[in-house]
């Protein structure tokens, strides 16, 4: 299991402990990828997981670019259309740095 996969598994467990329900992991399309799809009450939550073992080159949050946000939004819209879902959704970020985890709800 790669570091990225370990971070995603840890993020999934963390979100489940916070009351979210796991739906899918690593949903990929040619134009974008979604790390985790969760449900929180009536909302579908598309989660981007960022992990950095050290902050010397910028933290986990700094690793999220505007281009990545655009790709994640496109992938989420495509997922909703493919699954014929007309539901409220949001985009969260799990930023992991060394032994700390930060959950940004409705991050973008």
Curated annotation (Swiss-Prot):
Task: Give the family this protein belongs to, as stated in its UniProt record.
Answer: Belongs to the UPF0102 family.
In terms of InterPro entries, this protein maps to:
Restrct_endonuc-II-like, tRNA_endonuc-like_dom_sf, UPF0102_YraN-like
Q: What organism does the record attribute this protein to?
A: Shewanella baltica (strain OS155 / ATCC BAA-1091)
Domain of life of the source: Bacteria
Give the Pfam families listed for this entry. Answer: UPF0102
The record's annotation in PANTHER family points to: UPF0102 PROTEIN YRAN
Any one GO MF annotation of this record: nucleic acid binding
Q: What is this protein called?
A: UPF0102 protein Sbal_4100
Q: Output the SUPFAM superfamilies linked to this UniProt entry.
A: Restriction endonuclease-like
């Amino acid at each position: 299991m790669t570091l990225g996969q370990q971070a995603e598994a840890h993020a999934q467990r963390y979100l489940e402990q916070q009351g979210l329900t796991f739906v899918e992991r690593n949903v990929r399309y040619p134009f974008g990828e979604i790390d985790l799809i969760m449900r929180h009450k009536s909302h579908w939550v598309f989660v981007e997981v960022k992990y950095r073992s050290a902050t010397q080159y910028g933290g986990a949050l700094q690793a999220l670019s505007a281009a990545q946000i655009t790709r994640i939004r496109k992938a989420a819209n495509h997922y909703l259309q493919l699954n014929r879902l007309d539901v409220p959704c949001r985009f969260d970020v799990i930023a992991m740095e060394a032994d700390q985890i930060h959950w940004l709800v409705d991050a973008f």
